[in-house]
Amino acid sequence: LSSVNAQVKINEYSASNSGGAILDNTGDNSDWVELYNTTATAVNLGGWSLSDNPANLNKYTIPSGITISPNGFLRIWCSGKGNPADAVGHTHANFKLTQCNGDWIILSNGGALKDSIQMRRTQATHSMGRKPDGSATWNVLTAPTPNATNSGTGYTSYAPRPVMNLPAGFYSGTKLVALSVTPSN
């Protein structure tokens, strides 16, 4: 999927929200998507759609009355609850995010693709976010920032998993153990 130069962008997501650090309005550790308005004008998102399925761009329709402030942020909980927005704007999509490489988050309006991201796996409590906000550069954020500027240190990827030269087990005598990693591209 390719994106057009959108006013509103998918700016951050967490598909591994756990541990109680960021709870939704029902007290659950729901995953979430943050949208960012790159303009100096409020944007009415009522009728826009969010999806995790390229074959169904209209999987979740954002309720009428939901706007995103100029240069502002909007978090949509991906809880699977599909609840309409409450009085303070907590919005729950009717699907959940998964921790599978290759899954998508897609933002569209009237069937026209506005933005999309092919998700990457993250560790528990981490998120992926654009840094700086709205840019083309995605980073691992070890301190997620829903509804706020993506601040703090961002990492392009996780360190590769080390490999030992000997399999696990019990050995007699002295053994020389070496660790190695394959650098990521």
Model-predicted regions and their roles:
Residues 4-184:
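Intrinsically disordered, low-complexity linkers and terminal tails enriched in Ser/Thr/Pro/Gly
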